[in-house]
């Protein structure tokens, strides 16, 4: 009786980019960042974990809210895991403890426009 042959199939994401909705939380209140400082924070988080190669990843800040320190980021799909892990491990900005919270991730920007858990159906 012949053995059954198994074939491993890996499907790569057809999407060129992934979008992340993130929020930056500080332990102390009253810390403010403009969009340029926020972008620099992302690059330094990537540099801390992955060196200059990580810092060279193309990350775009599509929207940024200075009041809530939240943003929607666009990253090439191949760099998603690197960005996510560097944000997770980032812990301080100018000697002030902080943490990135990843709220949503999707290959579709439209998916980040609303939250289905808060949707009211009539």
Curated annotation (Swiss-Prot):
Superkingdom to which the source organism belongs? Eukaryota
Question: Which organism is this protein's natural source?
Answer: Mus musculus
Which gene underlies this protein?
Rpp14
Output the Gene Ontology cellular-component terms.
Answer: multimeric ribonuclease P complex; nucleolus
**Coiled-coil residue windows:** none
Q: Which UniProt keywords apply?
A: Nucleus, tRNA processing
Q: Does the keyword Transmembrane apply?
A: no
The record's note on quaternary structure and interaction partners says:
RNase P consists of a catalytic RNA moiety and about 10 protein subunits; POP1, POP4, POP5, POP7, RPP14, RPP21, RPP25, RPP30, RPP38 and RPP40. Within the RNase P complex, POP1, POP7 and RPP25 form the 'finger' subcomplex, POP5, RPP14, RPP40 and homodimeric RPP30 form the 'palm' subcomplex, and RPP21, POP4 and RPP38 form the 'wrist' subcomplex. All subunits of the RNase P complex interact with the catalytic RNA.
Give the Gene Ontology MF terms in alphabetical order. Answer: ribonuclease P activity; ribonuclease P RNA binding
**Family assignment from sequence similarity:** Belongs to the eukaryotic/archaeal RNase P protein component 2 family.
Major place of localization? nucleus
Location relative to the cell: Nucleus, Nucleolus
* InterPro entries referenced in this protein's UniProt entry, alphabetically: Pop5/Rpp14/Rnp2-like (IPR002759), Rnp2-like_sf (IPR038085)
Protein name as annotated: Ribonuclease P protein subunit p14
Q: What does this protein do?
A: Component of ribonuclease P, a ribonucleoprotein complex that generates mature tRNA molecules by cleaving their 5'-ends.
Extract one GO BP annotation from the record. tRNA 5'-leader removal
User: Quick check: keyword Glycosyltransferase in the entry?
Assistant: no
């Amino acid at each position: 009786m012949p053995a059954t042959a198994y074939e491993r199939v890996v499907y790569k994401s057809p999407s060129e980019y992934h979008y992340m909705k993130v929020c930056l939380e500080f332990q102390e209140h009253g810390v403010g960042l403009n969009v340029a400082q926020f972008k620099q924070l992302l690059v330094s988080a990537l540099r801390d974990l992955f060196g200059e190669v990580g810092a060279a990843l193309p990350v775009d800040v599509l929207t940024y809210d200075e009041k809530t320190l939240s943003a929607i980021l666009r990253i090439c799909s191949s760099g998603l895991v690197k960005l996510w892990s560097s944000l997770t491990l980032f812990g301080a900005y100018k000697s002030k403890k902080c943490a990135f919270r990843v709220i949503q991730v999707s290959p579709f920007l439209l998916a980040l426009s609303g939250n289905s858990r808060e949707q009211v159906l009539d």
